[in-house]
């Protein structure tokens, strides 16, 4: 009976609890992506993660989008705390592609091919245009070189993995990734090359049904333009401290990952609390 009463009260006075369609935008930023894991943990505790129907991510945001969709939160935390510090620093590379491939093998990406799981978009840039982008940016609009891939429509799990590798292939630090369309692609977060590091666009274009969109930034100064006539409510979560810029992007040490992950959790809780939202357990009582 107590649970029924609580649900009735919430339906009258806290409609936000029952908003059914959430979209999640995850930014790029290499090692700073641990922040998004902390945010995701908070979203789960607040009952929001369970209502996410679509993700849009760039670079590490794309990797996390797939991971959050296909793995339990505890497993995501374990991968970041135990696997990332070892695998992504092997082979004397800034970001080991070999290690990243091994990490992706630990995630059941075939779940993206099932309709019961959220949609996941990732952003990448055609590599053949990067040099021309630098030379000709003042003359040509290169926005169409940014490619948005909906992973759920891909029939080949191997191609899903390749698209996740492509969205996180940092120029000059890792090799471009050849996809099934015959083009080479690089990290979608490099906006000087035509990328989009805060990929809100796929949600705006394809998902008008969303009740709320949560945008997670990895830089406390970042800001994306949100249309004034957007019907969905937008909640922005950003670090309240500097995550050390580019140096933070290539820092995969365990202490840094733990610190940044905790920061993401704390910042998310602060934002959600300010929106008069509460952990799911707060709405239930023992019989």
Regions of interest found by a model, annotated:
Residues 57, 61:
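Gly/Ala-rich beta-loop-alpha elbow adjacent to hydrolase catalytic centers
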Residues 18-55, 66-287:
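Patatin-like phospholipase
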Residues 4-19:
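Sec-dependent N-terminal signal peptides
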């Amino acid at each position: 009976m107590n649970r029924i009463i609580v649900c009735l009260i919430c339906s009258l006075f806290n409609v936000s609890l029952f908003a059914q369609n959430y979209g999640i935008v995850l930014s790029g930023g290499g090692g700073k992506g641990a922040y998004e894991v902390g945010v995701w943990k908070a979203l789960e505790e607040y009952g929001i993660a369970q209502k996410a129907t679509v993700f849009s991510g760039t670079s590490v945001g794309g990797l996390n989008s797939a991971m959050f969709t296909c793995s339990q939160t505890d497993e995501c935390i374990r991968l970041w705390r135990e696997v990332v510090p070892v695998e992504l620093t092997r082979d004397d590379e800034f970001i080991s592609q070999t290690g990243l491939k091994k990490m992706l093998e630990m995630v059941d990406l075939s779940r993206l091919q099932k309709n019961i799981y959220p949609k996941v978009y990732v952003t990448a840039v055609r590599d053949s245009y990067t040099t021309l982008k630098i030379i000709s940016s003042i003359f040509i609009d290169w926005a169409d070189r940014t490619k948005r891939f909906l992973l759920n429509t891909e029939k080949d799990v191997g191609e899903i993995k390749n698209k996740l590798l492509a969205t996180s292939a940092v120029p000059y630090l890792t090799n471009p990734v050849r996809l099934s369309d015959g083009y080479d692609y690089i990290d979608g977060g490099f906006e000087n090359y035509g990328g989009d590091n805060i990929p809100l666009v796929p949600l705006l274009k394809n998902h008008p049904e969303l009740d709320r969109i949560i945008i997670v930034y990895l830089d406390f100064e970042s800001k994306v333009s949100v249309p004034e006539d957007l019907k969905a409510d937008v909640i922005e979560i950003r670090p309240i401290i500097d995550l050390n810029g580019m140096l933070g992007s290539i820092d995969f040490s365990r202490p840094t990952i733990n610190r940044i992950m905790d920061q993401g959790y704390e910042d998310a809780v602060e934002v959600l609390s300010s929106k008069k939202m509460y952990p799911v357990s707060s709405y239930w009582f023992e019989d």
